[in-house]
Amino acid sequence: RDAAIVHALRKGGAVILGKTTLPELGFGQPAATTNPWDAGRSPGGSSSGSAAAVGAGMVPVAIGTQGKGSLTRPASFCGACAFKPGHGTIHRGGDGGGQETNTHVGVLAHTAGDAWTVARYLSEAAGSHPGHRGMEGPKEPPPALMPKILVRLTAAGWDRTDAATQTAFDALLDGLAGAGVTIAEADELPGPRALARDLEAAAQALDVIADYESRWPLIMYLEQENAAPTGAYSERVVTRGLQRGRATRAEYHEALAFRDAFRATLDSCRADGLFFVTPSATGPAPQGTGDTGSSVYQWGSSLAGNPVISLPLMAVDGLPLGFEMQGFAGGEADLMAAALALDEGFAAGRY
């Protein structure tokens, strides 16, 4: 049967061309999908097939989910735009279950405007996830509006980021500064400084929450496979999967409390025209298909559940690289307006 978002797309007249690939169960053996710009490189993951299909021009729009970095990272590698609205703004019924409070539904598209149109439609037609508010804002993309302040939130990932990517990111920020946008370092402001300090802990909290919330149905499937091997899953995914679900209730409660505090710190940074920015990945697509790349730049936003967009505004070594912007809870329209302004004003760098 269709997931809620696929059902809504069909009702809206979308032509569903087919299913796309992803790493086994979202975290195991990567799929055979290759990068549309270099077949010897990874498309990223876990929404690898969706990103590759959009990046190759096979489809204008595809859907995916993100628990850690599964939308914006593959979009970065494949030259697509990825829009992850806030957690729960789009119904995720039928997506396979697990990681209930970490998983976000999002859209990959050729343009930011298309990503908005589809995401906004899904939030209304499929509805928000039970207990959550849907996306606010116009059904069509909002008017472009240049951001006022962009805060670099790169502390956790900068030392992991290759020199060419650092140079491309700095050059884009220099261009934005020349256009009148204030560029600030996280350590210059109290709230962003606290966020930057807590990013490593955010990754740990994400892992604990994922482990605890994966007990069903993931662990059930893998225990059945272990008891009576059917060949349904690779040894890699069974071994790694059974290591999940070991988080204790106390550890889970601690991670949830950390997330609440992290969200409060993030919300304290809210200001008109202010957004956080990072590269979408630590470099261009990795060689081979066994490595889907680092999710370091998605740790904070995946834990907090705030809206994020990745725009293919940079290139390194002839390969696309995304520029990621983070907004605030309920601020999808504000984030999209800023993204559209950047996409229009800096299209020359678009891959």
Regions found by a protein language model. Give the residues of each.
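A short helix-breaking turn/cap at a secondary-structure junction
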Residues: 81-172, 224, 346-351
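Glycine-rich, small-residue loops and helix-cap segments
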Residues: 10-19, 116, 122, 247-351
